[in-house]
Design a protein with these regions (language model features):
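Alpha/beta catalytic cores of nucleotide-metabolism and tRNA/nucleoside-modifying enzymes
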Residues: 1-15, 19-23, 29, 34-35, ...
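Glycine-rich, positively charged N-terminal anion/phosphate-binding segment
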Residues: 2-13, 28-104
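N-terminal small/glycine-rich loop or linker at the start of catalytic domains
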Residues: 12-24, 56-77, 112-122, 142-151, ...
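Flexible loop residues that form catalytic
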Residues: 53, 111, 184, 215, ...
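Short secondary-structure capping/turn micro-motifs that flank functional sites
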Residues: 55-57, 113-114, 187-188, 219, ...
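Alpha/beta enzyme core
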Residues: 88-122, 126-210, 223-224, 228
């Protein structure tokens, strides 16, 4: 793959926000909290979006939700993903985020394929209903004022019920600053290959910037996607789990430089793991054991693709304190580098395809006026 010519990848503007390197950290519930975002921020400039929170929980003053919505001291761009199914709650939540947290950007999630969300008409099921999607997005944009709003969605329910072109048009007409397409259907979940040709279609269909999401496992994939699709930028989800340094290589590749951390040393991984836990302990007002147990899923991602052996993996998944993690990482062979076959190892969600659970008759009339029950607003990561 020919390197990018310096300056060939144009900056992207979202309102007053200028992204010189058009890379976005995908918001992931339970993952992209401030400790993880701050780690990523130390490796490269990008738009680091806070984890998904629900509008209803904010409006109803759920203390944990407000804790998860917090930003770090000096965080350069206060960006957050909001999920809501009721336009009134969405508008109230956006105003509260502006007033209390002085947010700079709101992203909205319409891509979650989890059955307990879609069977109630939420998540990836919402774009089927054009009026519902439009009313939710319009309420967010109106409440946000000068704060840019973006939305993320999938191709559709399945290959027979594609909604992404309509969703892009609705977002543009509502005043969104950009959209992100996860180039899979809800039925696909996270299986198979992302359909980058769908991103191309969306780019050609609307005038606002399109970010592509799906199958960026190494930095060169980002350049391939942009060249293949004409997308304005890329959004990174599973590809950065367990490797926050991924953003350093993305910035390098998109600015015409060679990446140097595609195959890091296990010593670097150990150091970053310990740094990550220290940041978690500083951020969360919980006992050390609870915080370290929260980290265990990250630990599995950090060593994905590494030949560390079953015993070290077992010990990692049982750690209950920073001292225990320090002892386990002390047994790492710090000098080995990630094997070539480990670069593209998939992390987190890998399931699918699976029939999408939907309310009865949901696909019959895309223009139907509909109001969703509160049960459609469940805080489940996905997009």
């Amino acid at each position: 793959l020919d390197p990018a010519v310096p300056g060939a990848i144009s900056p992207v503007h979202l309102g007053q926000i200028r992204l010189d390197t058009p890379v976005v950290l995908a918001p992931m519930a339970g993952v992209t909290d401030w400790p993880f975002r701050s780690l990523c921020l130390g490796w490269g400039a990008a738009l680091y979006v806070n984890q998904m929170i629900t509008a209803r929980a904010l409006v109803e003053e759920h203390s944990l939700t407000w804790k998860l919505a917090e930003f770090g001291h000096g965080e350069p761009i206060r960006s957050i993903q909001l999920y809501g199914t009721d336009p009134k709650y969405v508008a109230l939540a956006v105003r509260m985020l502006k007033d209390r947290l002085d947010i700079d950007h709101v992203d909205m999630n319409f891509g979650c394929p989890a059955p307990k969300v879609t069977r109630n008409g939420g998540g990836a099921a919402i774009p089927v209903k054009h009026r519902l999607l439009g009313s939710i997005v319009e309420s967010a944009v109106k409440a946000a004022g000068e704060v840019p709003v973006t939305i993320k969605f999938r191709k559709g329910i399945d290959d027979d019920h594609l909604t992404f072109l309509h969703s892009g048009r609705i977002a543009q007409e509502a005043g969104c600053a950009a959209v992100t397409l996860h180039a899979r259907t809800a039925k696909d979940l996270y299986s198979g290959h992302a359909d980058w040709d769908a991103i191309t279609q969306l780019v050609e269909h609307i005038d606002i910037p399109v970010f592509g999401n799906g199958d960026i496992w190494e930095p060169w994939d980002a350049l391939r996607m942009i060249r293949h699709t004409g997308a304005a930028g890329v959004e990174i989800g599973r590809g950065c789990l367990g490797r926050p340094w991924f953003f350093s290589d993305l910035v390098s590749v998109l600015s015409g430089k060679e990446p140097n951390l595609t195959r890091p040393s296990l010593g670097l991984v150990a150091d970053v793991m310990l740094d990550h836990v220290r940041r978690l302990l500083e951020f969360y007002d919980q006992c050390e054991g609870d915080v370290v147990r929260r980290f265990r899923k990250h630990a599995g991602w950090y060593v994905a693709g590494w030949p560390v052996g079953k015993e070290l993996r077992r010990r990692l998944h049982a750690v209950g304190s920073l001292d225990e993690l320090t002892a386990v990482t002390a047994d790492f062979d710090r000098d080995i580098v990630l094997p070539p076959e480990g670069v593209r190892v998939k992390r987190s969600h890998t399931g699918g395809p699976r029939k999408v659970a939907l309310p009865e008759g949901w696909l019959s009339d895309p223009h139907e006026e509909i109001v969703l029950a509160a049960s459609a607003e469940v805080n489940v990561s996905g997009g």
